[in-house]
């Protein structure tokens, strides 16, 4: 073995490649070994440094692949298993244990998080060159007993069923140690580059090869000063120096320096200063302004702005002639930056490549498998079924059918497999207006929905009815299910029009899926298994699968984690996210074994076996990564720190603080928006692409006489956008609606037809004009539900009261109420709402009590005679108000009940309410409560009431009064309190209301004939003003405010974007007056 090192400013890989070429010329077979994370980059570098830039005699590979090359002619020791297959073996073993077999891990037996940790421990033991029996020294007997029991059972299955139970490296080491490869090895040379330590498994292999191969050459970066130092703890080169010293002692060889002493350039000065800082020698080298230009420190507001700044700089480099492949982007945290880089680099048209395996978790096939498993585990939740259908891989269902199906199951609140397996029968109404209720117009066409339900459910029912059986039988049923839903065809259809790169990803996803099914067949083929476990295994396997793509071209910006960097990697290097959170990185132990347990095991293990303790390596690894980063760029290095990282403030890295002590200044980027050369380079490159795409159209433009190139370009683009009806919106803090076009208004409101309004639509208009537009023009509705709402509750009570009032039989009052309740319950539409589940039945019981309590006011009030229920004024009976423009307004509505006073035959209106309501002249004036006055206006026009006097219009709150016993002293007071809760509230005409009893709350609500006329006149004005705005197509976004500080009206935030704190100026302020007389004067004078 030969150990070499060189200064970090020297090209170590070039030196080793030259030595490698010499070995190849001597007829040796050379393996150039690199770490897993650097093997592809190292191969590129080695080929670049070779004079002919190609060779068959040198193979750049990894330790793991070396075993394949040297054992290629050997019979496989067993069938190989990947991590997913190994996880299946662990699941199979754990599912066979009985309760109580495992003392520590008994509750985690089939938890896939625990299983993945077991797989990780299995591989840790292989890297540590240990077996599970070596864990005896960890002093946790119950934990060790559980692990031994699990791992021995796993090893037994692997051996009996012909799977590999040793890693490739362990197999190779065994063959080397037994001399079976001696003839093959004597002409082999190993060159090792990029390592700062070996695992115990790698070290055992190197030790076995050392006496048998022609040569082993290991090279690292270190300074002479560090290698010759007696104390290396904390030194920036400690990792590499410890590595050299350990190998030197083990293999009795001395490390030698190769190459010349490098010229002290700018980065060399930074490196020397950093080394001096950490070895406390204090010999700092002064830096010139030219030196300081080689490394830039950026401070940027947030992560998004960091990526924006890097993208702009890359465009500038490319504009100046650089290639994308000359630029390297390093990330402090890959996961938190990945999404931003994808969006922003695509926007800037920068090709890039993540050199990291990508999870498949976002792919529709993974969503399909996840939804199928959740559908089974959670017993057919609607959301899981919808997610399954929305994957796009389940049968051939159009978007329109899917929308219809989703709408129906949300309406019907479908839950459970039984509900989905039955034919759809319940239905709902499209609207809740009285006319539509009378027509019983239904929403859903069940003749369309039922075949769709059957198409969806038949394959699922067939799959899920499978009981516990062999893995092979379950797999056959699953394959039949996939064929029934056309999964292969849907996958092919989904990938048909994708790019070549995306199609390659689709292919890898499909290979992972089929490989997973093959593994399942091999491992569980003869095992008895439940469908739940089969789907759980399938889901875990797909979630753990990754794919790696190769860029379509080598001219891309490479993106990777900064701790995988090597010196002299690219011309321009940008390292972002380098705050204290990531720079340095603090690795944490995630193993099932604690570091204390690992250390105890290490103390009693042989020298060839050991666990790597990550916390012990943190300082050494971070110093090495920092030095590699400083020396990574050959032209320029930029290190960027976000002030806000992952929504929290991030401090400066200690390494950056040291660079600042050396004289480097941090530059704030992204805040000052000035025109710079970088901006010009960026815009020119983008505009040149735009001009190229528009060149045919631009050739027809008149160029002569134009003052500037930009004038023509902007004019052309505006014309192009206008021709395609594309508008670039101006971003402001205001929101506004557009006036409807004449064509739209003509279709909505024909000249020969009146405008139809009602009290509820008028309330919508004065609540927020845009609310009227949404509800009464667009007719948008919230998702309907089979669960009864306040409307159904009110309708239910209305029907009961109607039947009680109209019942002319000889039954006593309570019997009439009982009869009315029973008949109303039996109506099909109410039975649908109130018999579906326990909640609905309880609601019906509550309504039953309310009906019985509220009915007492009919029984005990003998002042009035009820004339009838639901008097409508519609069509030819509607109220008619003529407008100045020649059109008319027809006001439609339905009165719940008409009463006649026995003493004077005056009529009154009763409106049933499910909440407490009263008449407020202020609310009426502002258009918020026109209902009672509108009904009074209707009484003057209806044939049966126009010649009769009117005593008032009132609300009746239908309720079951709750009285606090502490507020009453005896039963008489209790009854009185109950009676005062059931009263009529509204407005009453003073002259006609004489003699009203305690059931009518007339205090402060008596109006004279003159005041009544004022109310009627103002009511008409409210309708006319609203009609004029509606017919003009103007619908302002103006929810009302009572106090000018908060908004009480409907804001419709999701549709309008209205925010009370930003748009309060757009809210309609209600008029305020203190006294009724002031309101009357205002209405008389027509004041706003």
Curated annotation (Swiss-Prot):
Keywords of the record: ATP-binding, DNA damage, DNA repair, DNA-binding, Exonuclease, Helicase, Hydrolase, Nuclease, Nucleotide-binding
SUPFAM superfamilies, sorted: P-loop containing nucleoside triphosphate hydrolases, Restriction endonuclease-like
Gene Ontology annotations of biological process type: double-strand break repair via homologous recombination
NCBIfam families the UniProt entry points to: rexB_recomb
PANTHER family: RECBCD ENZYME SUBUNIT RECC (PTHR30591:SF1)
Role: The heterodimer acts as both an ATP-dependent DNA helicase and an ATP-dependent, dual-direction single-stranded exonuclease. Recognizes the chi site generating a DNA molecule suitable for the initiation of homologous recombination. This subunit has 5' -> 3' nuclease activity but not helicase activity.
Protein name: ATP-dependent helicase/deoxyribonuclease subunit B
């Amino acid at each position: 073995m030969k150990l070499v090192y060189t200064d970090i400013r020297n090209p170590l890989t070039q030196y080793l490649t030259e030595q490698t070429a010499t070995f190849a010329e001597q007829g040796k077979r050379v393996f150039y070994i690199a770490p897993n994370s650097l093997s592809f980059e190292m191969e590129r570098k080695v080929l670049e440094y070779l004079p002919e830039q190609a060779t068959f005699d040198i193979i750049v590979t990894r330790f793991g692949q070396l075993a394949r090359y040297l054992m290629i002619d050997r019979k496989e020791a067993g069938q190989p298993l990947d991590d997913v297959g190994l996880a299946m073996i662990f699941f199979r073993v754990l599912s066979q244990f009985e309760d109580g077999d495992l003392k520590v891990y008994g509750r985690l037996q089939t938890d896939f998080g625990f299983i993945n940790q077991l797989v990780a421990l299995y591989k840790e033991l292989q890297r540590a060159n240990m077996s599970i029996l070596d864990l005896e020294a960890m002093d946790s007997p119950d934990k060790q007993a559980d692990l031994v029991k699990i791992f021995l059972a796993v090893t037994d299955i692997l051996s009996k069923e012909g799977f590999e139970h040793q890693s490739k490296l362990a197999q190779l080491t065994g063959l080397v140690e037994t001399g079976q490869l001696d003839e093959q090895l004597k002409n082999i040379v190993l060159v090792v580059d990029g390592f700062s330590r070996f695992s115990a498994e790698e070290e055992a292999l190197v030790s076995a090869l050392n006496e048998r191969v022609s040569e082993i050459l290991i090279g690292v970066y270190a300074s002479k000063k560090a290698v010759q130092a007696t104390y290396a703890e904390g030194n920036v080169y400690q990792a590499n120096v410890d590595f050299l010293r350990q190998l030197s002692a083990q293999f009795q060889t001395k490390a030698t320096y190769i190459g010349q002493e490098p010229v002290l350039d700018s980065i060399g000065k930074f490196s020397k200063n950093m080394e001096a800082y950490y070895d406390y020698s204090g010999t700092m080298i002064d830096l010139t302004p030219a030196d300081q230009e080689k490394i830039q420190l950026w401070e940027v507001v947030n992560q998004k702005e960091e990526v924006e700044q890097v993208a702009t700089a890359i465009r500038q480099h490319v504009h100046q002639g650089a290639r994308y492949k000359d630029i390297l982007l390093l990330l402090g945290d890959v996961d938190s930056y990945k999404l931003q880089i994808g969006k922003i680099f695509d926007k800037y048209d920068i090709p890039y490549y993540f050199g990291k395996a990508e999870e498949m978790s976002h792919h529709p096939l993974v969503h399909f498998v996840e939804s199928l498993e959740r559908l089974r585990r959670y017993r057919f939740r609607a959301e899981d079924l919808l997610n399954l259908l929305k994957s796009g891989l389940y049968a051939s269902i159009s978007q329109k059918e899917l929308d219809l199906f989703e709408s129906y199951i949300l309406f019907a609140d479908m839950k459970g497999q039984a509900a989905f397996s039955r034919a759809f029968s319940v239905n709902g109404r499209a609207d809740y207006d009285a006319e539509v209720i009378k027509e019983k117009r239904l929403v859903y066409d069940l003749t369309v929905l039922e075949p769709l339900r059957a198409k969806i459910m038949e394959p699922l029912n067939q799959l899920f009815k499978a009981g516990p059986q062999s893995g092979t039988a379950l797999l056959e049923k699953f394959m039949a299910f996939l064929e029934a839903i056309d999964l292969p065809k849907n996958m092919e259809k989904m990938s048909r029009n994708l790019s070549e790169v995306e199609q390659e990803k689709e292919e890898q996803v499909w290979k992972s899926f089929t490989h997973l099914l093959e593994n399942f067949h091999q491992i569980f083929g003869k095992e008895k298994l439940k469908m739940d476990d089969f789907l759980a295994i399938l889901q875990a396997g797909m979630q753990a699968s990754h794919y790696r793509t190769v860029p379509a071209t080598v001219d891309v910006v490479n993106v990777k984690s900064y701790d995988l960097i090597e010196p002299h990697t690219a011309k321009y290097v940008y390292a972002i996210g380098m705050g204290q959170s990531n720079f340095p990185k603090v690795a944490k132990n995630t193993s099932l074994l604690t570091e204390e347990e690992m250390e105890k095991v290490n103390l009693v293990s042989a020298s060839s076996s050991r666990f790597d303790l990550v916390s012990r390596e943190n300082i050494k690894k971070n110093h090495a990564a920092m030095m590699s980063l400083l020396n990574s760029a050959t032209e320029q290095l930029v290190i960027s720190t976000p002030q806000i990282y992952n929504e929290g403030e991030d401090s400066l890295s200690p390494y950056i603080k040291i660079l600042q002590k050396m004289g480097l200044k941090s530059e704030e980027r992204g805040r000052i928006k000035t025109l710079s050369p970088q901006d010009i380079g960026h815009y020119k490159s983008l505009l040149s692409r735009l001009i190229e795409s528009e060149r045919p159209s631009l050739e027809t433009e008149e160029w002569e006489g134009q003052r500037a190139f930009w004038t023509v370009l902007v004019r052309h683009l505006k014309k192009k956008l206008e021709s395609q009806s594309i508008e670039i919106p101006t971003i402001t803090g205001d929101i506004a609606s557009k006036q409807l076009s004449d064509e739209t208004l003509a279709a909505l409101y024909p000249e020969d037809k009146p405008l139809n309004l009602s009290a509820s639509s008028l309330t919508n208009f004065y609540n927020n004009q845009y609310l009227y537009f949404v509800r009464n023009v667009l007719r948008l509705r919230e998702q309907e539900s089979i669960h009864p709402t306040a409307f159904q509750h009110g309708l239910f009570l209305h029907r009961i009261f109607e039947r009680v009032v109209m019942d002319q039989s000889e039954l006593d009052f309570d019997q009439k109420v009982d009869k009315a309740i029973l008949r109303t319950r039996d109506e099909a539409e109410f039975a649908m709402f109130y018999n579906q589940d326990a909640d609905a039945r309880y609601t019906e019981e509550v309504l039953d009590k309310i009906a019985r309590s509220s009915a007492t006011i009919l029984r005990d009030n003998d002042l009035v005679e009820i004339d009838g229920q639901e008097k409508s004024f519609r069509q030819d009976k509607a109220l008619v108000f003529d407008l100045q423009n020649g059109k008319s307004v027809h006001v439609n509505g339905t009165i719940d009940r008409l009463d006649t006073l026995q003493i004077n035959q005056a009529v009154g209106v009763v409106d049933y309410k499910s909440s407490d309501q009263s008449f407020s002249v202020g609310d009426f004036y502002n258009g918020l409560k026109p209902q009672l006055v509108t009904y009074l206006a209707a009484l003057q026009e209806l044939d049966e009431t126009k010649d009769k006097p009117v005593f008032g219009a009132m609300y009746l709150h239908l309720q079951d009064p709750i009285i606090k016993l502490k507020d009453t002293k005896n039963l008489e007071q209790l009854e009185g309190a109950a009676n005062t809760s059931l009263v009529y509230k509204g407005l009453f005409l003073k002259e006609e209301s004489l003699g009203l009893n305690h059931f009518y709350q007339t205090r402060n609500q008596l109006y004279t004939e003159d005041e009544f006329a004022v109310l009627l006149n103002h009511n008409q004005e409210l309708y006319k003003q609203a009609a004029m705005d509606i017919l003009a197509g103007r619908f302002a976004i103006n929810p009302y405010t009572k106090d000018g500080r908060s908004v009480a009206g409907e804001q419709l935030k999701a549709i309008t974007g209205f925010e009370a704190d930003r748009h309060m100026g757009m809210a309609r302020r209600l008029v305020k007056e203190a006294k009724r007389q002031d309101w009357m004067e205002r209405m008389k004078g027509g004041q706003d």
